[in-house]
Amino acid sequence: MLSVTAKKRILADIKNVSNDDIKKQGIFYSMNEADMTKGTALIIGPADTPYEGGFYFFGVQFPPDYPFAPPAMTSLTQDGITRFNPNMYREGKVCLSLLNTWHVGERWSGCQTLSSILLSILTSVLVNKPIQNEPGFETRTESEQSHVYARMVLHANLQTAALKMIQSPPEYAADFYDTMADAFNKNKKKLVDLAVGLQEYDNKTETMDFFRMTITYKFSTVADKIRDCVPRNPFPTEIE
């Protein structure tokens, strides 16, 4: 059972994460109307990273003793193949010091908020050279492995996090779909350009043994599908 302190703090965090300044950075949140301790967060991948224009969803679960313990977070944007980031596991685990799921870096304290967690993911996880987040690879950002991994993530970002999410959105995306459609239309040309710029890799297979990933690129096909995609909200809307 939630304490009065936990209820007040959760509501305050939700209000804070829903303000315009946070939304301008591509961060959005929807509370579960049946259970305020549960919710879904959306981070739109930042420009100039392999995550650009992708829709990255996270399940949020506040604990009964919030804010004395951090919320639990689950990475929902998955394709079953790609390790989208060293901090985001295929099974959904989010490895972050603020969540007390990683031992290096700033730990959770009661002064932290849901906003600070999501901003940390935006700025420290969804980065230009994601391999730098893997222990032992911090100084190997210009290595061949770094470039291969970033390319694999970008392909999955375009194919799954951007295109599939807008064409076949899961139920948890319902509250965000109009925002997603606006972002997709705004970013469409850039997403197509990113795919076209790497079409020389079409039909080439690359492997990242460290993350157990193998991918055969289809950048031209992805570019065509993004170019032709017209977002249509599949979720029923209430008629007043």
Model feature map: region roles:
Residues M1-G54, Q61, D65-E240:
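UBC/E2-like fold recognition across ubiquitin and ubiquitin-like conjugation systems
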